């Protein structure tokens, strides 16, 4: 390992900020909340006097495991073996804290699918099909084992406050008034797995489509793949040449969890 090259690499932050004012929570899941627990001094605030046991600040967070930039472990869609549930199997024991970190990093292959972004109908996602990936390979070379495929949809532009931010998830999923984000079909997940790809990332709310999110999760996670969702800044990466890293919070028996995604670019 060339430590000098590593130390001089440019770091690109691929994580989105989590806030009560931003659309980072899947509709119907636990709402994100961030509140103060202890303040430097007892002062009057909008909800009363702050707690202050000592002169320091600490806050507490309530959030869904799949809020903000996060990853899906197999247990997100694979029930535990012996549960008697459909699709149960050994991967149902691979919780987030048991996913090896090396599975969440590798050379990045950025597949630009922004051209699909305006092709969805209200409440429906345009699908990224195997032929889209094959066309990318014809131009950029075959995908290699352990490469991390990052789908650049451009959907992160809707991760904003206010009415415009409703296009990120609320419009496609709740009201059905706006199109869904581009998302890989189940067949695409299988194709990537057959190419030796372990991890897929996307700069959109989910690897799953707005209209049928479950099958692609069952196909991919059921094969031991890992999905990293709600990324950003994929436009700062070359098609190839960056090294992707996702470092999740190590939560016992989780179905995945939030973390920090980044890419290392050699100078």
Question: In which residue ranges do the predicted regions lie?
Answer:
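Active-/binding-site microenvironments in catalytic and ligand-binding cores
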Residues: 1-267
């Amino acid at each position: 390992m060339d430590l000098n090259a590593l130390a001089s690499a440019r770091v690109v932050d691929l994580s989105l900020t989590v806030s009560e004012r931003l659309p980072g929570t899947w509709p119907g899941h636990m709402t994100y909340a961030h509140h103060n627990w202890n303040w430097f001094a007892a002062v009057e605030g909008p909800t009363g006097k702050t707690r202050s046991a000592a002169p320091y600040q600490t806050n507490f967070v309530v959030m869904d495991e799949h809020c903000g930039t996060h990853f899906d472990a197999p247990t997100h869609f694979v029930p535990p073996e012996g549960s008697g549930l459909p699709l149960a199997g050994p991967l149902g024991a691979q919780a987030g804290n048991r996913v090896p970190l090396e599975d969440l990093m590798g050379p990045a292959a950025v597949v630009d699918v922004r051209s699909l972004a305006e092709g969805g109908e209200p409440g429906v996602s345009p699908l990224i099909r195997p032929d889209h990936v094959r066309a990318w390979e014809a131009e950029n070379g075959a995908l290699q084992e352990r490469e991390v495929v990052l789908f650049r949809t451009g959907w992160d532009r809707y991760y904003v406050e206010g009415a415009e931010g409703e296009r990120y998830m609320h419009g496609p999923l709740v009201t059905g008034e706006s199109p869904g984000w581009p998302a890989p079909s189940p067949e695409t997940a299988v194709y990537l797995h057959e190419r030796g790809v372990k991890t897929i990332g996307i700069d959109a709310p989910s690897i799953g489509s707005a209209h049928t999110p479950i099958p692609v999760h069952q196909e991919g996670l059921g094969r031991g793949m890992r999905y990293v969702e709600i990324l950003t800044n994929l436009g700062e990466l070359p098609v190839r040449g960056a090294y992707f890293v996702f470092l999740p919070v190590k939560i016992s028996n989780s179905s995945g969890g939030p973390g920090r995604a980044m890419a290392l670019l050699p100078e």
